[in-house]
C-alpha cells in the first residue's frame, strides 16, 4: 500500500522528483534532501531568473493581453504570430489585387477568361481550401509542421508565378487560365495548412496571440494593395507592367520566406527543449528558477512538442503500445466544439459570405469625378478596404469589445447587420455606371468620396467581427485539447463562408453586368 501511494505521488509533475527506488526505503532522507534543495534554490532564484530573462527576451513578465500593440510587438513570440498572419493572407491578397493585371495583360479584357477570372479565382481558392480544411480538421496533430509546410508551398507557387509572368505570352489563353487556377488551388491549400497550424497553437497560447495573427492578416491586405496602387502610376507600358508585377510576386516570395525564418528562430514549437529535461515523464529541477515566470508558455509548447515527437515516432515505425489510444484521445468531436462555439463560428461564416461580394463591386464600380483613371481608382478602393480591415482588427482588442458583456451572440447579430451594405453597393454601381462617361456630372466627386467611405467602413466591420470572433474562441473552451482542435474547426467555417460567398459573387457579376448595360 505504501509503495502504491508513493508511486502515485511521483507521477505528479512536481519540480523536485525523488528516485522511485528511494521512495520506498528512505522517505525521511528524501524529505531532508528536498528541504535542502529548496533552500539552495531560494538563495539562487534571483540570479537564475535574471539569467533566464536574458536568454528568453521573447517572454514578457507582464500579462501580454494588457499591453498596447507597440509593446506586444517587442515580444518575439507575439511578433512571430503577427508575421505569420502577414504570410497567411499576403499571397491571397497578392493574387486578388493583381486581378486587373491578369484580366488586362493576360486575358485582354474582352475574352470570356477575363470576365470570369475574379469569380473563378475565388471559387477555386475557397472550395479547395474548404475541402482541405475539413481533411486537416480530422487530423488533430502535427500543427507546427503544418505551419512550415504551408509556407513552403506558398514560396514554390509564387516562384513559379514569377516565371509565368515572363513566359505567359507563349501559351494559349485557356492554358494560362487553367495553369493560374492550379497555382491558386495549391496556394489556398498552403494557406489552409499554415492557418490550421498557427491558429491551433495560438488558441492554446491565448487570445492575444490569436489577435496577433488577425492583425498580421490585415497588414497583409494593406501592403500588397498599396504596392499595386503605386504601380498604377507607373507609365502604362507592357515592359513596366511586367516588371512591376514580377517585383510584386517576388516580394510575396520574400515575405513568406521571412515568416519561415522567424518561426524557426523564435522556436515556438521547440524552444522548450532548451529549458526542459523530461525523463520518464518527470520534470527535473532545471526549471526551478525559470518556471515561475514562464510556466504557462512552457506547458503549452511542451505539450505540442510531445505530440509532435509521438508523430515522429509513428512515421519512423516505432509506435508505442498506447500510441493508438493517445491519437484517439486527441480528437475532439465536432459536436462538442459546435455546441460551445456556434455563435462565433456562425459569425465567421456570415462575415466571409457577405465580404466576398466586395471584390466584385470594387472592380466594377468606376471613378466619376476624382482625377484618377480606373486603373488607379480600383487599387485605391482595395487599399481603403484593407486599411479599414486593419483598423477593425486593431480595435477588437479594446477592453469594451473583450468584455464578457459583448457576448458571442451579440457578435453574431453584428455580423448579420453587414448585409445592409450590399444594397448600398448596388446603388453606387448604378450611379457610377450611368455617370462615368459624363465629365460634368454634378456631385460626382462626392459620390466617389461616399463610395470610398462605404468601402472603408465595410472593411472595418469585416476585420472587427473576424478578430473578435477568433479572440473569443479560447474563452469558450475548457482545455487545451479543445483549443487545439478549434484551430481546424474554425477554419472550416472560414473556408466554407468564403466558398459560399465566392459562388454568390457569380450572381452579382451578372447583376452588375445587367446594371451597366
Curated annotation (Swiss-Prot):
Alphabetical keyword list: Membrane, Phosphoprotein, Transmembrane, Transmembrane helix, Transport
Transmembrane segments: 76-96, 116-136, 151-171, 174-194, 214-234, 243-263, 344-364, 367-387, 411-431, 446-466, 492-512
Membrane topology, as annotated: Multi-pass membrane protein
Major location category of this protein: membrane
Domain of life: Eukaryota
Modified residue annotations for Phosphoserine: 45, 58
GO molecular function, one term: nucleobase transmembrane transporter activity
Bias kind Basic and acidic residues: ranges: 25-44
Coiled coil region boundaries: none
Subcellular location, record wording: Membrane
Any single GO CC term annotated in Swiss-Prot or TrEMBL for this entry: fungal-type vacuole membrane
Gene Ontology biological process terms from the UniProt entry: nicotinamide riboside transport; nucleobase transport; nucleoside transport; transmembrane transport
InterPro entries: ENT1/ENT2, Eqnu_transpt, MFS_trans_sf
One of the Pfam families matching this protein, by short name: Nucleoside_tran
Residue ranges, annotated region (Disordered): 1-63
Protein's job: Has broad nucleoside selectivity (uridine, adenosine and cytidine) and most likely functions to transport nucleosides across intracellular membranes.
Miscellaneous: Present with 217 molecules/cell in log phase SD medium.
Official protein name in the record: Nucleoside transporter FUN26
Organism: Saccharomyces cerevisiae (strain ATCC 204508 / S288c) (Baker's yeast)
Gene: FUN26
Amino acid at each position: 500500500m505504501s509503495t502504491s501511494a508513493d508511486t502515485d505521488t511521483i507521477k505528479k509533475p512536481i519540480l523536485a522528483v525523488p528516485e522511485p527506488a528511494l521512495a520506498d526505503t528512505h522517505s525521511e532522507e528524501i524529505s531532508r534532501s528536498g528541504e535542502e534543495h529548496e533552500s539552495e534554490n531560494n538563495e539562487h532564484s534571483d540570479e537564475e531568473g535574471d539569467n533566464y530573462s536574458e536568454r528568453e527576451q521573447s517572454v514578457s513578465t507582464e500579462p501580454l493581453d494588457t499591453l498596447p500593440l507597440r509593446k506586444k510587438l517587442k515580444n518575439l513570440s507575439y511578433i512571430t504570430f503577427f508575421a505569420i498572419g502577414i504570410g497567411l493572407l499576403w499571397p491571397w491578397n497578392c493574387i486578388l489585387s493583381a486581378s486587373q493585371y491578369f484580366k488586362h495583360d493576360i486575358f485582354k479584357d474582352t475574352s470570356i477568361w477575363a470576365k470570369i477570372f475574379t469569380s473563378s479565382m475565388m471559387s477555386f481558392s475557397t472550395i479547395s481550401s474548404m475541402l482541405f480544411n475539413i481533411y486537416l480538421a480530422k487530423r488533430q496533430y502535427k500543427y507546427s509542421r503544418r505551419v512550415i509546410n504551408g509556407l513552403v508551398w506558398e514560396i514554390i507557387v509564387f516562384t513559379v508565378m514569377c516565371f509565368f509572368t515572363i513566359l505567359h505570352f507563349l501559351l494559349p489563353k485557356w492554358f494560362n487560365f487553367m495553369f493560374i487556377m492550379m497555382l491558386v488551388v495549391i496556394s489556398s491549400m498552403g494557406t489552409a495548412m499554415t492557418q490550421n497550424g498557427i491558429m491551433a497553437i495560438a488558441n492554446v497560447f491565448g487570445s492575444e496571440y490569436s489577435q496577433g495573427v488577425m492583425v498580421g492578416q490585415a497588414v497583409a491586405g494593406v501592403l500588397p494593395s498599396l504596392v499595386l496602387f503605386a504601380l498604377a502610376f507607373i507609365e502604362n507600358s507592357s515592359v513596366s507592367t511586367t516588371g512591376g508585377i514580377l517585383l510584386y510576386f517576388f516580394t510575396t516570395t520574400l515575405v513568406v520566406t521571412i515568416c519561415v525564418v522567424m518561426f524557426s528562430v523564435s522556436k515556438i514549437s521547440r524552444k522548450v527543449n532548451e529549458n526542459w529535461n523530461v525523463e520518464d515523464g518527470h520534470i527535473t529541477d532545471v526549471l526551478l528558477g525559470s518556471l515561475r515566470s514562464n510556466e504557462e508558455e512552457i506547458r503549452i509548447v511542451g505539450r505540442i512538442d510531445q505530440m509532435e515527437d509521438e508523430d515522429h515516432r509513428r512515421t519512423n515505425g516505432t509506435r508505442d503500445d498506447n500510441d493508438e489510444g493517445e491519437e484517439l484521445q486527441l480528437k475532439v468531436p465536432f459536436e462538442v466544439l459546435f455546441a460551445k462555439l456556434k455563435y462565433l463560428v456562425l459569425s465567421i461564416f456570415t462575415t466571409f459570405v457577405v465580404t466576398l461580394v466586395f471584390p466584385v463591386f470594387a472592380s466594377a464600380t468606376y471613378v466619376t469625378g476624382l482625377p484618377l483613371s480606373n486603373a488607379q481608382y480600383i487599387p485605391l478602393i482595395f487599399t481603403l478596404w484593407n486599411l479599414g480591415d486593419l483598423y477593425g482588427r486593431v480595435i477588437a482588442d479594446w477592453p469594451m469589445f473583450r468584455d464578457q458583456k459583448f457576448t458571442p451572440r451579440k457578435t453574431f447579430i453584428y455580423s448579420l447587420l453587414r448585409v445592409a451594405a450590399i444594397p448600398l453597393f448596388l446603388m453606387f454601381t448604378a450611379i457610377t455606371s450611368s455617370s462615368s462617361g459624363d465629365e460634368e456630372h454634378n456631385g460626382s466627386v462626392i459620390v466617389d468620396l461616399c463610395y470610398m467611405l462605404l468601402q472603408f467602413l465595410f472593411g472595418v466591420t469585416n476585420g472587427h467581427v473576424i478578430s473578435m470572433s477568433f479572440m473569443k474562441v479560447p474563452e469558450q473552451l475548457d482545455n487545451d485539447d479543445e483549443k487545439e482542435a478549434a484551430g481546424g474547426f474554425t477554419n472550416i467555417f472560414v473556408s466554407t463562408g468564403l466558398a459560399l460567398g465566392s459562388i454568390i459573387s457569380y450572381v452579382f457579376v451578372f447583376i452588375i453586368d445587367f446594371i451597366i448595360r
